[in-house]
């Protein structure tokens, strides 16, 4: 082997080793959010936000899940086919006294629902959530913190922000023997998740597929095993919760794991 060939081979080996290490390494730091952008906002759900319960993210009762009224339904352009569920936004009304609350306050909301398009209406007159518009349909109590009721729709500025949650990531396990459907809620940091894996005490890690919203499924038989979960957020950071469900777990139970740092 010539000296040149040896150096090339050594460089390729070092490069491959570096790429493998970078791929498997943990990403340092915390989620930092994004830049301010422009959109519009309306409201729904009534003065008590009761009409916002359930929704396309699968969170069910938003009060008991800890989201409360600080929620929003996202237009197609923002919803990302459900992968944006759990993302957190800071929103403020464009500083216009005709439509905005004095002082230009901002609100913090979590994406919990989908605002469907209405192609029977033009995008600037009723079809507020039609693509490609970026639009937030806010729980009514949150809208009234930034905009006047008589306005109906207001121009806003928004940005992604880190989600700050109390307690750990929650895993609600539903399904039956050969089908596990896990609802993932209360995610801090980026808030929205791109991947979930589950590990039984007698199995290797099994990558789950997204069923809908933030419900993730697996066909592995896990009954009688303690369960660990690994959640990967949209910023590619991962959080592993070891043995959060004991071997005696039952379908319908919720378990709290390790959350992301904020």
From Swiss-Prot:
Keywords: Cell wall, Cell wall biogenesis/degradation, Disulfide bond, Membrane, Secreted, Signal
Main localisation: secreted
Organism: Arabidopsis thaliana
Topology versus the membrane: Peripheral membrane protein
Cystine pairings recorded for this chain: 57-85, 88-163, 93-100
Family: Belongs to the expansin family. Expansin A subfamily.
Subcellular location as annotated: Secreted, Cell wall; Membrane
A GO cellular-component term linked to this record: membrane
Stretch forming the signal peptide: 1-25
Gene: EXPA3
Record's protein name: Expansin-A3
């Amino acid at each position: 082997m010539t000296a040149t060939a040896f150096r090339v081979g050594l460089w390729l080996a070092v490069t491959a080793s570096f790429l493998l290490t970078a791929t498997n390494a943990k990403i340092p730091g915390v989620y930092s959010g994004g830049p301010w952008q422009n959109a519009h906002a309306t409201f729904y759900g009534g003065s008590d936000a009761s009409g916002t319960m359930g929704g396309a993210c699968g969170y069910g009762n938003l009060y008991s899940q800890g989201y409360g009224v600080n929620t929003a339904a996202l237009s197609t352009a923002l919803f990302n086919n459900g992968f944006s569920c759990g993302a957190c936004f800071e929103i403020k009304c464009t500083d216009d006294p005709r439509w905005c609350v004095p002082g230009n306050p901002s609100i913090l909301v979590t994406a919990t629902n989908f605002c469907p398009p209405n192609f029977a209406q033009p995008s600037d007159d009723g079809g507020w959530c039609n693509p490609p518009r970026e639009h937030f349909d806010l729980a009514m109590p949150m809208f009234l913190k930034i905009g006047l009721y008589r306005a109906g729709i207001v121009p806003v500025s928004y940005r992604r922000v880190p989600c700050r949650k109390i307690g750990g990531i929650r895993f609600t396990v539903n399904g039956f023997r050969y089908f596990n459907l896990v609802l993932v809620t209360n995610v801090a940091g980026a808030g929205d998740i791109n991947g979930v894996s589950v590990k039984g005490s007698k199995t290797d890690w099994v990558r789950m597929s997204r069923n809908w919203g933030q419900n993730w499924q697996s066909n592995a038989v896990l009954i009688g095993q303690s369960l660990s979960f690994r959640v990967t957020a949209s910023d590619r950071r991962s959080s592993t919760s070891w043995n959060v469900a004991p071997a005696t777990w039952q379908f319908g139970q919720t378990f709290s794991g390790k959350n992301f740092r904020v």
